[in-house]
Regions:
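N-terminal pre-Walker A segment at the start of P-loop NTPase domains
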Residues: 1-20
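Phosphate-binding P-loop
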Residues: 18-27, 133-136, 167-168
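Generic beta-sheet signal
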Residues: 28-32, 139-143, 171-173
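ABC ATPase nucleotide-binding domain signature region
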Residues: 31, 41-107
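P-loop (Walker A) phosphate-binding loop of NTP-binding proteins
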Residues: 35
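GG-anchored amphipathic helix commonly corresponding to the ABC/SMC/Rad50 NBD signature/C-loop
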Residues: 115-143, 153-165, 175
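Short loop immediately C-terminal to the Walker-B catalytic DE motif
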Residues: 147-148
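C-terminal lobe/lid and adjacent interdomain/linker elements of RecA-like ASCE P-loop ATPase modules
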Residues: 153, 157-218
Length: 218
């Protein structure tokens, strides 16, 4: 189960707001959608500050912990892991221990790669750390805009990766995304502003006026 209550308003989140994803996480993978600035990342950063089983030396970790005091969380997960495209993209590995490990992985050579290629390197590094620690049906993985900048090929790889984590590794996966391809390939879209599940195609049509059929991953 996963239910987050905002006790003190912060950023664009209001005191008293309740985000109950319990019924939706039973589907194993959920895509959280909403406008820029509606509070999606802020809410899950606060959750990250409360429980993160892959804590790093990122300079942002103390900020996340400060946000955690604004929420109350009910969950039954033994492990919770996070990947944030902006906060975990390699630029904050400023402690020697983390830096040495990153060099060994080839991570610092990403400056010669495209944005999408670099992002995939960071995601692969993140997953190599957490996959051995996944507890079946008791692990939550939050991927925050990890698919930004991906080509269609990379988007397909990312969608299949999410399904692998949820269906093979038996982890619950929450993906925050603005990517129409991933939204339409999702089992479910959770409208953050409306706090309820929506049809992916209906959501895209409501926001853009475009009709997009559901994407079937292979």
């Amino acid at each position: 189960m996963l239910k987050i209550t905002v006790n003190n308003g912060f950023r664009n989140l209001r005191a008293g707001d309740v985000y109950d994803l319990t019924d939706y996480t039973q589907l194993k993978s959920v895509c959280v959608v909403g406008e820029n600035g509606c509070g999606k990342s802020s809410l899950f950063q606060a959750l990250r500050g409360m429980k993160n089983d892959a804590a790093t030396s990122s300079l942002y970790e103390s900020d996340f912990k400060a946000l955690a005091s604004n929420i109350t969380v009910e969950h039954d997960y033994e492990k919770i892991f996070y990947f944030d495209r902006v906060k975990d993209n390699g630029t904050d590995f400023q402690v020697a221990y983390d830096a040495s490990g990153f060099i060994e992985s080839g991570g610092f050579y990403t400056k010669s790669k495209s944005h999408g290629e670099s992002s995939m390197v960071y995601i692969d590094k993140f997953l190599s750390k957490i996959i051995p620690n996944i507890v079946e049906d008791k692990t939550l993985i939050v991927l925050d805009e990890a698919d930004a900048g991906f080509s269609l090929t990379k988007q397909k790889q990312f969608a299949n990766l999410v399904y692998h984590l949820s269906l093979v590794k038996k982890a619950d996966v929450i993906v925050i995304s603005h990517n129409p391809f991933f939204i339409c390939s999702s089992i479910l879209a959770y409208d953050f502003t409306k706090k309820k599940a929506v049809s992916a195609s209906d959501y895209i049509r409501e926001v853009t006026g475009f009709n997009i059929s559901k994407v079937e991953t292979v």
